[in-house]
Amino acid sequence: DVGQECLDRVAIALGANTVLPCAAATIPALLGDGDWRKRHAALVALAQIAEGCVKGMNKDVAGAVAPCLGAATNDPHPRVRWAAVNGIGQLCTDLGPKIQEKAHAQILPVLLKAMEDSSHRVQSHAAAAMVNFSEGCPPEHMQPYLDALMNKLLQMLQGGHRMVQESALTALASVADNAQTAFAKYYSTVLPFLKQILVGAAGKEHRMLRAKAMECISLVGMAVGKEQFAPDAREVMDLLMQLQAGGFEDDDTTASYMQQAWTRLCKCLGRDFIQYLQVVMPPLLKSAQLKPDVQVTDAEDHEEAEEEEDVEVIAVGDKRISIRTSVLEEKATACNMLCCYVDELKDGFLPYLQPVVETMVPLLDFYFHEDVRKAAVASLPDILRAGKAAMLKQCVAPTGQTVDAAYFRQLVGYVVPPLIKALSKEPEVEIQAAMLESLADCAGVAGEHISEHIAAMIEGFQSTLKGSLERRAERNKRAGTEDFDAEEMEALTDEQAAEDEVFDQFAECVGSLLRSLHAPVLPALEPLLAQFVAPMLGPDRSPEERRIAICVFDDVMEHASDGGASLRYLDGFAGPCLAGCTDADADVRQASVYGVGVMAEKLGQAFAPHVPASLQTLAQVIQAPDARGEENVNATENAISSLGKICEFQRACIPGPESVVPQWLSMLPLTEDKVEARAVHTQLVRMLEANDPHLLGPNSEHLGSVVKVFATALPTAGLSEKLQLCTVECAGKMKALLMQMQGSVPPETLTRAWSAITPEQQQALQQAM
């Protein structure tokens, strides 16, 4: 165990460039050795170094997992097969989701075969590895294997060995979570099994089996949805209530599993769950309101004392502070569960909204446990959403007061100022970022009701940014010292990443205020923009700072240009934005080319003088030698999107639009940046519906390019968001346009356009139609 931990830490400290050559020189020979212990060691080592070597291994994920795939089912020794399966699971976690995308066809059959292993441990671990795999896998890649996988898991459930059954239940839950509605066909077979386990698993030795059955039932319910689960819901809820009424011993983890199951069932049943709140809420509020179990003693009194497993000890001077972590973990879990109920039920949660607010707000500075603070921070936007939903429906609070605008404003006033105050005192950079994220969300929900808190928010932003910039300067100073080494560099990089997240969330806060209040908020933001953001556009600042400054001004242009309010920033922003389009950093390029498109769309004639330079710069980005490389492709697709906006909104300023617009069309479809792809393909449809004079050409000679886009995008409309290239609404319009073209375009033109796509694309398009 110590050796494994050391290997993990060495890989993280030294990274792929140092560790992978050593591994490549050592592991293959060990894998071919006749001694099973050496083969076992090689596979364990491979799993341990993965986290630290992600960048290197991601270059060839199939090659990285190949040694494990070979040994998982073929090695004669069960402990080697176990190590191989363990390696597959670990690599799926560390190299996901790329490994699932690239190697699903190799990994899934191996795991399915390993589930039939003669060793219960290997079987059980194969099911556990399936959990790792499914968590990062798009449902489309799992679907072809679902029948075989479900058959295996059901066989394992019936097998009788408790360890195998427990792992099978966890895997079944994970598969249901991944498959979602596609799991419906297995529901009638699976649920009776699960209910049988829930009823029959009695005694201490079966506690975990029963707990995992709860977990599985709730995830299956969430996957198939309320309509299919509803006939069984009452029976399941009654079983859970009976178990809860019976109480749990202190060492019984069932209570924790039950709380999480209640939460999932709430998500499944929606408002039908409200009737069960009276059962669920009392113990949950009790857990959320637990006081920390803290003891302060003299350090010298306990030199010989044995430390308890769930007690954390901190030495402060000559004192010894003991904190019972199990209490804090229970409190944190309960707070997270409360967030879920508020989020799901919204106005339906109104009877409990006040006690939850009164529980959560004081926890913003609960310094005993970070997860408790994080949960409190995360709950506040959901609390406001619940209050807003109650206001819109004019619900009646338990006090008898109708929830109106005054009630909601009061709720905003109860939640937002303590969050701003907590931000200024928060010692952890990661939680500062979470607080800024929460503030951004609160501002978006509160809308005009945030106005009276803007001055305090901006003061909080200034204080946070000042502290962050000071810490950056201190880190840069440290990096310049003579004895600064690689290990310190690794730590500094991690600190910098956390600091960058603070700046990211600050930008999100400003964006949220601009989206909520538009141009009228600009005067209040002016000092912040002038003193902190504009200087970050300078070429001497770090790429991350430049990117964030560009993102902020992108938002200014996008959301505060009504009445020309943003034009005062145009001259100061256009230059850095165009320069950023060819920056060495891909993220700076992406933010910059996006900004060019925003200005083209929002600023009208005022942007006209910048159109020639913008066209030239975007062409540089799009035509760069490695424009479609993995690191650059998102910036490239955003550049194509911005070129489209210039074509649509700045047409009069384009020299030779009859050639530029078809050139833009020929760059489509977009396939990598799914958000931008959906936006651009919707724009294309909009331009076609408006009979754009330059898009198709005088004799519809560019119709083939349109058909190519439709053939790629249309079949994806029904897929998950990660794979969807056009919305369902856009797909409907594409179909209507194709039908319209069949009646209005000459047959020979249609034939020529149809021949521009492959037979496979033709078939996919016909099926989509």
State the predicted function of each range.
Residues 1-769:
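Karyopherin-beta/Importin-beta family HEAT-repeat alpha-solenoid scaffold
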